Amino acid sequence: ENTLDKGESDIELARKLKDNGYRISINIMATDLFESRLSCFEREAAMLLAGLTPRGCSKETQLRMYNGFMKEIEQLDTLGLCDDINVFVRGENINRPPVLKYSKGSSEYLNFKSAVVTERNRQREALLNEPDKYLLRIGKARDIISEYGVNETLTRNSLTGLKELQSDFIQELDKDEPEQ
């Protein structure tokens, strides 16, 4: 398991694995950035409810990672170092398995990148079509983190992050609104 964002060291590791007879399968979860950012806060809230110490993920880290892996996967594929590339989207809910949307060699998509971009765009459209649901989820995460936060600094950082996420989402909604 790897995040594929370390460049040459990832490529060298893949080369060593292939040289030793291993198959390399790359599985990508295509997730819209707004969904991904909120999911981190929802995971944090769930960990707090379970009495566990959460780990946060900053907006900066998310932005760096969001498309950072694509170039590396493309390079691994070009070098013949990956046997399978699969693109999934999340299941309908936490109890549903991820749904396969692309598999190298047999798919409606030209390549994994077009699958990732198209599926992310579909998710964005769905979020923008039902903004109240998304904003409600932000509110639920905020309430849980406010009530169960383990320390003042982490709680403040998370609440600031949620406020920024909500603001970013509202700006996106405003961009999407047709001018009158």
What is each of the regions a protein language model found here?
Residues 8, 12, 31, 35, ...:
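Charged, alpha-helix-enriched surfaces in structured cytosolic catalytic cores
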Residues 1-27:
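Glycine-rich phosphate-binding loop used to anchor ATP phosphates in small-molecule kinases
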